């Protein structure tokens, strides 16, 4: 690592270590990979398993990490009377022995999302007090586990999801709406599992790690109300199908505290991932500064704000002096407004906005990506930004500002070869952003 850095002597005789492009890119990728590795289900799940049941064990689950979590449970308990079924995103399945793995669509549900919900709901019914239900919940479960309520159809559910994703609502707000339009989310699955013992193992992808929000809380009492959901729809002017509007007016409330029981264990989370990223930064000789694991807001606005922080760190040593890395987690949003044909997720949009705001500033590199390996609906986890990113984009015929306005950030980073492609990581602790100031 030392050969990729050099000593720069300042006018007052002081010296500082500076970074070249190769070393900065390598370190940023190691930082991102360390964050992902901290949420490896094989380790996180096994270390948090409950006591073995006297009766049967039924494993259910939903999310991008659910198949890998299920495989860990099956391998850890070879002598337990165990069966089950979980649903994960297409392309994220792995063999899990006695536990059936289904795949469904994300972020917009399909027919398999409904079939998975039906099978999982049936699997937890008819159990006794000596039986154990282990629920494996991770990000993405909201679209993978779908049980329309009222007169809603799959087409209606898809329309709701698409409207929510384009609205600019936070993930918490979107999940509040989803819970009140579902017969399985918002604690309904926990109610169905009674009187069996219920233990939920969660890999969190939501800011603040609220278990009632992760995958829309199928096994957790719901603190939100129908009125809350209706207020969110009004606040963002979201156009819902008539069947969905009827549910918000006439539907039944989700189970509340005292109506369902169960133990919740958080096995991996954004905060843990950021600590792992910080440790990797220290190993590389960088001073890590964690801004928080729950940053939210418009991706392009977040990019502009982060550019200001990075420039202040480089020029003034505030809020941290170079060499340093500024870390953050959480989930930004992208408000599309009128439909566009642009490609890209929230992380590449954040990075393109950051690059535009930095205007090619020297000594600053950045990486941002979704820890599940998929930024939005694209085939990349995210991308990298370097001081020469804008120049290389223009050389490739890309106008960075126009591309940002068109929400076409994926195209910009693909043109310069700076997408970060990991493939499905089989876990999900939301987004990780790291800005290196050399």
Curated annotation (Swiss-Prot):
Q: What class of enzyme is it?
A: oxidoreductase
Q: Which GO terms describe its cellular component?
A: cytoplasm
What are its E.C. numbers?
1.1.1.81
Can you name this protein? Putative hydroxypyruvate reductase
Q: Name one Pfam family in it.
A: MOFRL
* Factors inducing expression: By tartrate.
Entry keywords, A to Z = NADP, Oxidoreductase, Plasmid
Listed pathway(s): Carbohydrate acid metabolism; tartrate degradation; 3-hydroxypyruvate from D-glycerate: step 1/1
């Amino acid at each position: 690592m030392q050969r990729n850095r050099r000593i720069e002597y300042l006018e007052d005789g002081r010296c500082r270590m500076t970074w070249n492009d190769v070393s900065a890119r390598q370190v940023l990728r190691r930082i991102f990979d360390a964050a992902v590795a901290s949420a490896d289900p094989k380790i996180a799940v096994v270390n948090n398993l409950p006591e073995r049941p006297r009766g049967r064990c039924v494993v259910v689950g939903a999310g991008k990490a659910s198949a890998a979590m299920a495989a860990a449970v099956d391998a850890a308990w070879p002598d337990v009377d165990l069966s089950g079924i979980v649903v994960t995103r297409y392309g994220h399945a792995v063999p899990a022995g006695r536990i059936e793995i289904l795949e469904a669509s994300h972020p917009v549900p399909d027919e398999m999302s409904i079939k998975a919900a039906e099978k999982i709901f049936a699997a937890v019914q008819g159990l006794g007090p000596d039986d154990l239900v282990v629920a494996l919940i991770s990000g993405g479960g909201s679209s993978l586990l779908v049980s329309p309520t009222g007169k809603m159809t799959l087409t209606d559910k898809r329309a709701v999801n698409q409207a929510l994703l384009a609205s600019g609502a936070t993930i918490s707000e979107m999940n509040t709406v989803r819970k009140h339009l579902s017969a399985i989310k918002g604690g309904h699955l926990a109610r169905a599992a009674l009187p069996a013992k219920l233990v939920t193992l969660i890999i969190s992808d939501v800011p603040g790690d609220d278990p009632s929000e992760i995958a829309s809380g199928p096994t957790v009492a719901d603190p939100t109300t129908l009125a809350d959901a209706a207020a969110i729809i009004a606040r963002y002017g979201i156009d819902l199908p008539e069947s969905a509007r009827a549910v918000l007016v006439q539907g039944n409330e989700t189970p509340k505290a005292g109506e369902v029981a169960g133990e919740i264990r958080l096995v991996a989370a954004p905060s843990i991932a950021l600590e792992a990223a910080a440790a990797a930064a220290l190993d590389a000789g960088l001073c890590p500064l964690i801004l928080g694991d729950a940053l939210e807001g418009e991706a392009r606005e977040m990019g502009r704000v982060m550019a200001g922080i990075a420039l202040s760190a480089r020029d003034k040593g505030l809020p941290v002096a170079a060499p340093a890395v500024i870390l953050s987690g959480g989930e930004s949003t992208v408000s599309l407004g009128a439909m566009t044909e642009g490609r890209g997720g929230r992380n590449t949009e954040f990075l393109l906005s950051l690059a535009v705001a930095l205007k090619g500033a020297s000594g600053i590199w950045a990486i941002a990506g979704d820890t599940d390996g998929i930024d939005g609906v694209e085939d990349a986890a995210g991308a990298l930004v370097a001081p020469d990113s804008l120049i290389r984009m223009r050389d490739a015929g890309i106008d960075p500002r126009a591309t940002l306005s068109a929400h076409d950030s994926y195209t910009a980073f693909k043109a310069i070869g700076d997408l970060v492609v990991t493939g499905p990581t089989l876990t999900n602790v939301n987004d990780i952003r790291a800005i290196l100031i050399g």
